[in-house]
Amino acid sequence: MDYLPMFAKLDGRPVLLVGGGEVALRKARLLLAAGARLTLVSPELEPDFHQFADRFTHLAERFTPAHLTGQILVVAATDDLEVNALVYQSANQLGLFVNVVDDPKRSSFIFPSIIDRSPIMVAVSSGGKAPVLVRLLRERLESLLPRHLGALAELSGRVRDQAKRVLSSISDRRRFWERAFASNTLAGLIEKEDWQGAEQWLNDGLDQAKNEVGEVVLVGAGPGDPGLLTLKALQQIQQAEVVLYDQLVSPEILDLVRRDATLVSVGKKAGAHSVPQEETNRLLVEYAKAGNRVVRLKGGDPFMFGRGGEELEVLAEEGIPFSVVPGITAAAGATAYAGIPLTHRDHAQSAVFITGHCQIDGKEPDWQQLAATSQTLVIYMGLMRSEHIQQQLVSHGRSSATPIAIIERGTTARQRVLTGTLADLAELAAQAVSPSLIVIGEVVALRERLAWFGEGQQQGTCDLKLVSLA
């Protein structure tokens, strides 16, 4: 970053402003609003300065370096380039922060564009590179931030000490304030300027928060691309105090989790269950009963082969509040990024999703039904049993010439798509790594025309790869 954003407390501190025109007038109003003890150096002043002449000291003379004595901050706002340069050089020699208006090269600090909801202040800056863009951003933020935001901050300041007495844990207080600030009830009371009612609402909330249990939100992280997160999923992971995540959740998505949250890996890979499901269930209950806002973050959609239903059953038995944020499942996301439509009027009237894992009782799926030619078959976690899947489909009537694709790390920058026919499935699977999705059906052939993502990634058929290896 070119500049460090920070807020300076100028109340009663000496600040020098050089200039007496309209630009200097704007800076004077801003500095006085911040409580600065302002000295203004200029032979002449705009008439409007006289409206608040009793709030600053005016020296009707040209600037000299001696004017810097005792100042902590300096602003040059003249149209005289030589004067501005002298102010900059003199202040620099004394190690003072100096701003030359509209001259970033001669400024050790700059004034940002400000959205004022005192005591809430929002500052936006481009470092002088794009002032029009900054103005547009400020206008957008002005329209988004409610006018009662400052009043809400003042109110919370009055209740803050009481919150510390009632809720000894920092995490408990943080949770209380997050829920309060998100409450439409509190916002409505403040909108009506019912300050007494709003303060009473907060105090009542503190009494309830003392014995409050936490909650769990089951969140689908989508297939990998952070851009495919839903807005609600993003909100939940940024509000979470504890996040239990699977190995399928991409690092880019984990980077979006709030920095002070506790991250717990309960990752699973096919054939390598690093954390038993029972332990995951125990952790969910333990963290929630400690009063935490817990997010259970799963790749894809939590109810699509993600054991989300099993985890919610445990929470229900324990009386822990929960909610669910669906995600884009890999079958929808990865195939779209691979240019493979799941259904097509000419090729597939339906799509079937199955898991390649064996059921606990060893029962086989209905292969006769899965081998139907008018549907697309999508197999999650099927690499390890690819040879068995291939044999069963062919033996139950699916043509060995049926187009197939294996989508590896779908929707991410490392996406790779291996294509071939059903006869090649086991051989292609041996070249793929998890997480991968197997797609079987005539729609795969459309990829040759519809592929759009991952230019330069592997798109050859099994036959071409075999030739290159010979």
UniProtKB/Swiss-Prot annotation:
InterPro entries: 4pyrrol_Mease, 4pyrrol_Methylase_sf, 4pyrrole_Mease_sub1, 4pyrrole_Mease_sub2, CobA/CysG_C, NAD(P)-bd_dom_sf, Siro_Cobalamin_biosynth, Sirohaem_synt_dimer_dom_sf. The keyword Magnesium does not apply. The keyword Cytoplasm does not apply. Residues 214-470 are annotated as: Uroporphyrinogen-III C-methyltransferase. GO terms for molecular function: NAD binding; precorrin-2 dehydrogenase activity; sirohydrochlorin ferrochelatase activity; uroporphyrin-III C-methyltransferase activity. Keywords: Cobalamin biosynthesis, Lyase, Methyltransferase, Multifunctional enzyme, NAD, Oxidoreductase, Phosphoprotein, Porphyrin biosynthesis, S-adenosyl-L-methionine, Transferase. Its EC number is 2.1.1.107, 1.3.1.76, 4.99.1.4. S-adenosyl-L-methionine binds at P223, G299, G300, D301, T329, A330, M381, G410. CDD domains: SUMT (cd11642). NAD(+) binds at E22, V23, P43, E44. Residues 1-202 are annotated as: Precorrin-2 dehydrogenase /sirohydrochlorin ferrochelatase. It comes from the Bacteria. Then it catalyzes the NAD-dependent ring dehydrogenation of precorrin-2 to yield sirohydrochlorin. Finally, it catalyzes the ferrochelation of sirohydrochlorin to yield siroheme. HAMAP family: Siroheme_synth. This is Siroheme synthase 2. It comes from Aeromonas hydrophila subsp. hydrophila (strain ATCC 7966 / DSM 30187 / BCRC 13018 / CCUG 14551 / JCM 1027 / KCTC 2358 / NCIMB 9240 / NCTC 8049). The lineage of its organism: Bacteria, Pseudomonadati, Pseudomonadota, Gammaproteobacteria, Aeromonadales.
